[in-house]
Amino acid sequence: MYFRIRKLDEPDSNDNDFYVVIPVKDIFTWFCSIYSLDKTSIFIHDINNLNPNEYTIQQVIPGSDISPIKNLNEYLTNDIIITNTLDLNDLETFIYLLTNGANNSEGIKLLVTWCVYYGRLDVLNYLVDNNILPTENTLRDYLPITISENHDEVYKFIIDHEFHLGYKSNNLSWILTSEYKYINSLKYTLSNDLKLSDLIFMHHLKVEILQELFSSGYEFDNRLFEKICRTTNITLIKFFMDIGFDPMNIVIQPNQLCIYLANILLDSGRQFTQNEISQIITFSIVSDDYWDIIAFTERTGYNWNNINDNFINCIIRRGSLDHLKDILNRTSLNINRFIDNIVITAIFDSRKDLIMYAYENNVDIAKYIQSLPYSNDTNFIKWYIELLNSDGNFKSDNNIINFINHGTGTHKFEILKYLLENDCYEDPNYIIEHICCPFNIGKNNTDIHEPIVVELLNLCESKQIDVPKLTPIIISNYLLSNRKISNTLLKFGTTIYSDGIIDNDSDINNILLNIINNQCEEIKDYVYNKPQLWTNKSIMLATIISENIDLFDFLLELNRDNNLYLEQSFILCANSIKMLKHFVNSINLDITSRVRETYVYAYSIIKNKSVASYLLLYYGNDMIYDSDNIFENQKNLFVNDFLREIKNLNFV
């Protein structure tokens, strides 16, 4: 029994004539996990008949009913007959699936999580009543989070059936103490022997939750109060003291003592050593007011020469410049001891005040240029460079420009623009190299980078700076499946590259650009008169990607007696299912020896699942998967050597 899972926004059929279907045993794994716990956007179609011999892909299909993809619990078929569409809101759907084989351990575990998340008590009750449960401990590490309106009922059910469902009540405590809306569930949990003092983390506790529990008669213990006192949450500490808890009855180490409690202990007669005071103020600097800490040190007679570096570094990271100056004035410490941390922190946090403090103390801030990549503030980086360029003689070195390679933020291209506009460079070629960085960025980011790249190129043109590699890079990206970026740059017009077919026989850039731009009127005559171009694989690949069947047939005809060229063309058809089908229908050639390589190219290298699926259905699983390690020998593939040439801008 197989099912097809379809999202609401997916069409009822597809253009590729094949469908992914799921065996019943894996149905919960798929819709609970792979479809991201989304119960509102999925159809589950009950497939009654899988008979690919009735409907074929291009009139050819292997004899097996279905072709499995190794290591994935999905199957491909080109024929489905939908007998029923199942409703996930109906309990009968789950009963139907469970009684027909959807009961493997992983699927049940995910189903329980899904039911908790959506509050499906009807399904949970059915699972418990019929002893269809996860294996022991499978959910021990899962937090049972629910988004349902009936969360109180869901959590009560989990508590009552925690052993059956594979949860532990302790896992609930963190959730139930995070928001007041869970107060009823928390009370029910506490009435079933869960203790708040078993909580590992206390910082998130809400005082209104504790107030409600106290009003309802819940008894807190000293163990819980001790854990609360180890936090810096003064509101919680005050609450416990107001209801009668005494900090003198517990033992708290100085390195876990906030200033508020430390002052209370002082009032009660406790004395602290210089080392203990250092520990207290270092712990408190994260959350306590700086001047409260200073008042505590004055009260205890603290000698600031005993301070440790951790305290100073915390002031640098978390405090104000005034606090840093005050501390350094109180100690005999030299600023140079902390200057690296000051400047690097300033760059990370875009702190101009710290940079100016270092600058005014004669620190050479130029040596920290290599840290600029870690700032995401364009204005700060510009300001930093302006500070370096205060005499108008600053020229960027490779360290500044190199940060363009450390990320994909638009602000990094803005800095290149600033360097170009202000002539802050010695060699423009090094900057120009980095203008091409968008080509190495995932194609999904193209829309983000297009405007700034256009500005950079226009700026280069206005300054008469040549960008010699741009044309081959455009072509390379088009041939390497980064086509959206290439098409973006093709919009820039004839200022970037020459028009028409070029006269130099050795240069095929314009041939490829014309194919990419679908301006192929002259290409056939030109190529026909240049036999040295007949077997050029880059021309064939551009033709396949552009799906120009007329030019494709022309190139195949030129090479009809060249079996190696034809086989390699078949492999390159992995880029287009349309061209692959056309090749199969047009060329009478045994290319079975190349099917596996074509599949690896489609599935693993360019991620063209449509072509990979077509090959599985067309040629059969056995032909492709004669080995369990077909992806391990990719280095020996023809296509890898060819793609490497393209990356090197060599269009062979």
UniProtKB/Swiss-Prot annotation:
Residue spans of the ANK repeats: 77-105, 106-136, 138-167, 192-219, 220-242, 243-274, 307-337, 396-430, 468-498, 535-564
Keywords annotated in UniProt: ANK repeat, Repeat
Protein name: Putative ankyrin repeat protein R734
